[in-house]
């Protein structure tokens, strides 16, 4: 059954948030799972009586006292927690605390399904080389931009078979973030995370659609979307030697114009080891996923398999070619000089693709400690894939993989319990893209819960999702187009240039972090409050494909039947 999805439904979110959000009750503005944890934050230095009132009847359905008040240092706030987990009936409710403005909330069996569809559809809105028609894009329809059929080889990428200035084709793909360039390294974790969502929630995605041009074909919408980027990634490999170009870019960032108005020459820049390894890992996983869809995508699984192996071979011969930004290029670098985690991740994916033991041996030789995943720290991704296919491992290997994941998850669960806000975010998590840190921590907790089911893991996962959806010091849903209050001025060129008041929906803003590298005007330097909803703030209000991917994953996770969490 086709699930209708109208982008027009997202334009109603309020544009501005209160000057003093600390004085407000904080809830998950998208709602709570009927069988899940339900927490709200009450500011103040003492316990508070609270009650939940059913709407529209006005009946009081739950009363209790909040927890002991505690200081949450990242926000400089003393707060207590209202826990109404016992309330499980679906419906609209009002949370009431004397002295505070009441706040409405929703309890539902699937409160996040529509939000999920918007978060994944954000990738459609960021497609390069395609016109967005009103039938699919609504008011955000636009002409095609960047056909990328006349891309030049930059001097940094020149080779005997492709000298400087050679013209090549490299269409499709997703614009990386607020800019219009395309980067292999950042596409690595982004594309992998979406493929992993397919792997972990296959039944959900077989029946879920969100109105993209491919929705009527015989492929799941998720894989159609991912293929748009995989096809571009495939074109970024030099067929002569298997090396992979680091990025497709203009020399400098374009201005705040629509994609079809950004017409500066674009280039393929430098082959790097990091690009080759990200490419190898993603193409190996994609080959496994697409093997089921040979009729719809003939030859593609075999092509991606071959390309993954060739990229690995190139990286093995060139293990330390790091990205060096050319003097005439000023766009994103995605530089990384610690590649042991990329080697281990790619080795794990190639082992699962080929079944060849040397790849598995390479994984265990190169494996790094598990950390919260990011584009520069991908050690956990190989563990995730091996844990999913643990029957292929010896008992000793299986235990090593499992314990590497669960040990970190135990730390995150402890952070949740210790937090006054009941969110597993500590000061060092408030970095560029802090909201993606929250979502990637939640993914790790989900993976751990699949190994050993623990209520503490699920509670910490929910706490992290609550945080980005409104239960935070700014009383802000960080996803455009949703909640009572959400970002209106994201650092995203189409949203800035399209003359539409509302931003493109479904994008997760980067989030609070004290670096303030953009030199915009902020109201606070506190880690969890250092955020400004302004186009100028690329340090806190940009959107990127790698930040949205873990949000998509977690919204899919929380759209599963509760016993499967």
Language-model region placement:
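C-terminal transactivation domains of fungal Zn(2)-Cys(6)
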Residues: 208, 249, 282-334, 391-392
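Surface-exposed, active-site-proximal loop segments in enzymatic domains
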Residues: 203-218, 260
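Bacterial N-terminal signal peptides
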Residues: 4-13
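N-terminal edge beta-strand
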Residues: 21-23
């Amino acid at each position: 059954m086709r699930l209708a999805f109208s982008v027009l439904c997202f334009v109603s979110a309020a544009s501005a948030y209160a000057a003093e959000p600390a004085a407000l009750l904080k809830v998950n503005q998208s709602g709570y799972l009927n069988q899940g944890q339900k927490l709200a934050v009450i500011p103040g230095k003492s316990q508070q009586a609270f009650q939940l009132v059913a709407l529209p009847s006005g009946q009081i359905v739950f009363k209790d006292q909040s927890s002991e008040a505690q200081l949450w240092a990242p926000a400089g706030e003393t707060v207590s927690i209202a826990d109404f987990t016992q309330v499980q009936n679906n419906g609209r409710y009002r949370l009431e605390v004397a002295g505070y403005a009441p706040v409405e909330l929703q309890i539902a069996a699937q409160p996040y399904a529509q939000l999920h569809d918007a978060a994944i559809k954000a990738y459609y809105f960021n497609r390069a080389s395609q016109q967005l028609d009103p039938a699919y894009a609504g008011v955000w329809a636009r002409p095609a931009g960047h056909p990328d059929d006349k891309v030049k080889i930059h001097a940094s990428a020149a080779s005997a078979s492709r000298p400087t200035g050679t013209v090549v084709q490299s269409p499709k793909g997703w614009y990386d973030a607020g800019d219009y360039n395309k980067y292999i390294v950042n596409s690595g974790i982004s594309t992998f995370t979406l493929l992993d969502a397919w792997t972990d929630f296959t039944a959900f995605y077989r029946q879920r659609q969100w109105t993209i041009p491919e929705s009527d074909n015989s492929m799941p919408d998720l894989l159609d979307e991912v293929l748009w980027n995989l096809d571009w990634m495939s074109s970024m490999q030099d067929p002569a030697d298997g090396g992979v170009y680091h990025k497709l870019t203009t020399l400098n960032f374009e201005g705040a114009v629509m994609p079809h108005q950004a017409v500066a020459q674009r280039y393929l820049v430098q082959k790097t080891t990091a690009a080759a390894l990200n490419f190898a890992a993603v193409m190996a996983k994609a080959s496994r996923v697409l093997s089921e869809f040979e009729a719809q995508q003939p030859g593609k699984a075999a092509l991606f398999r071959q390309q993954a192996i060739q990229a690995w071979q190139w990286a093995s011969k060139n293990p330390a070619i790091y990205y060096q930004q050319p003097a005439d290029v000023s766009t994103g670098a995605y530089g990384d000089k610690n590649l042991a985690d990329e080697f281990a991740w790619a080795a794990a994916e190639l082992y699962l693709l080929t079944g060849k033991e040397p790849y598995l041996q390479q994984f265990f030789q190169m494996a790094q400690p598990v950390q919260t995943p990011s584009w520069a720290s991908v050690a956990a991704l190989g563990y995730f894939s091996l844990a999913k296919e643990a029957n292929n491992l010896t008992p000793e290997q299986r235990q090593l993989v499992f314990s590497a994941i669960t040990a970190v998850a135990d730390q995150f669960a402890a952070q949740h319990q210790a937090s006054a806000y009941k969110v597993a975010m500590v000061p060092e998590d408030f970095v560029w893209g802090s909201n993606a840190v929250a979502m990637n921590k939640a993914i790790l907790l989900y993976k751990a819960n699949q190994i050993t089911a623990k209520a503490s893991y699920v509670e910490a996962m929910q706490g992290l999702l609550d945080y980005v959806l409104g239960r935070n010091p700014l009383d802000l849903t960080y996803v455009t187009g949703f909640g009572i209050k959400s970002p209106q001025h994201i650092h995203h060129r189409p949203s800035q240039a399209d003359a539409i008041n509302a931003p493109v929906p479904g994008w997760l803003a980067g989030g609070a972090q004290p670096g303030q590298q953009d030199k915009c005007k902020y109201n606070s330097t506190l880690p969890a409050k250092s955020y400004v909803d302004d186009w100028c703030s690329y340090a806190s209000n940009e959107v990127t494909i790698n930040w949205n991917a873990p949000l998509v994953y977690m919204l899919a996770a929380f759209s599963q039947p509760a016993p499967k969490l």
